[in-house]
Amino acid sequence: MLHNIRIVLVETSHTGNIGSTARAMKTMGLSNLYLVNPLHKPDAQAIALSAGASDIIGNASVVDNLDQALAGCSLVVGTSARSRTLPWPMLEPRECGVKSIQEAAQAPVALLFGRERVGLTNDELQKCHFHVQIPANHEYSSLNLAMAVQILAYEVRVAWLDSQRQDATVQEASVYPVAEDLERFYQHLEQVLSGTGFIRRAHPGLVMNKLRRLFNRARPESQELNILRGMLTSIEHTQKPETPAPDTGHGRPQA
C-alpha cells in the first residue's frame, strides 16, 4: 500500500526542502516522490538534508506539470493553509491518512504540497477530491514544507499499521476513476453545458467550479462515471439536427 502513496511537491524553490521531505518520507516508509517543475533540480544541499534518504531523491519523478504527477491516481488530496472563496470537502490529517490507505490498496494516491510561500493555486486545488488542513496554532501556524509532509506521512503510517492489525475481510472494493478520466469528464460536461446554453463557453465561471466540487464530493465510481459520460453523449445526439433521408424517387406518382 505505501508504495502507492505519492508525495507531490509543486514548484519547490529551495532544494533543501526536497532533501528534508525525502527524510520525512523515508522515516514513515514512503518512497514515491514527485517533483512538479521544481525551480532548481536536487543538488548537494538536498542530498545533505536528506540525511541518508538520498535514494528517495535519486528515484524521484521530475515532471513538467501537475497532470503528469496525478496520472493514474484515484484519490488526490491537496494541502491548504487557509480558507478559500469556494469551500471544498475537507479532511482532518487523521482522516486523510485513513482514506489514503484505503484507496492505496487499489490505486495510486497523491498528496499535494504547494510552493513554500504561496502554496497551491485555486486551479491546482480544484483538481483535488479533498483538501486537508493541519490544525496548527492560530497565533503561529508557520509550518515549513518538510514539517507538513512529516505530519501527513505520519498519519498515513499510523493508518497503515492499523490496517495491518485488523482482521482481513474480503470485500468487493470500489473502483474509482483516475485523475485524467475525471478531467476528460469535466471537459465533456463543460462542452455539453455550453452547447445547451446553460453556461457561456467563454466564461464558465463558478458554475464549473461548483460542479467540480459536487462531483469530487460525490466520488462517482468508474462505472458511474461511464454512465454520466453516456448521458452527456446522449444529450449531444439530441442536439444534432436530424439529417433528412435522401429522396430516392420511390413512391412518386407516375406521369
Curated annotation (Swiss-Prot):
The keyword Ribonucleoprotein appears for this protein: no
GO CC, one annotated term: cytosol
GO biological process: tRNA nucleoside ribose methylation
UniProt entry keywords in alphabetical sequence: Cytoplasm, Methyltransferase, S-adenosyl-L-methionine, Transferase, tRNA processing
Reactions catalysed according to its record: cytidine(32) in tRNA + S-adenosyl-L-methionine = 2'-O-methylcytidine(32) in tRNA + S-adenosyl-L-homocysteine + H(+); uridine(32) in tRNA + S-adenosyl-L-methionine = 2'-O-methyluridine(32) in tRNA + S-adenosyl-L-homocysteine + H(+)
Subcellular location: Cytoplasm
E.C. numbers: 2.1.1.200
Region listing for Disordered, in residue ranges: 236-255
Gene3D superfamilies noted in UniProt: 1.10.8.590, 3.40.1280.10
Binding-site residues, S-adenosyl-L-methionine: 79-81, 114, 134, 141-143
Major site of localization recorded for this protein: cytoplasm
Highest taxon of the lineage: Bacteria
Cell membrane in keyword set: no
MF GO annotations: RNA binding; tRNA (cytidine(32)/uridine(32)-2'-O)-methyltransferase activity
Protein purpose: Catalyzes the formation of 2'O-methylated cytidine (Cm32) or 2'O-methylated uridine (Um32) at position 32 in tRNA.
Record family assignment: Belongs to the class IV-like SAM-binding methyltransferase superfamily. RNA methyltransferase TrmH family.
Subunit structure and binding partners: Homodimer.
Protein's name in the database: tRNA (cytidine/uridine-2'-O-)-methyltransferase TrmJ
Primary gene name: trmJ
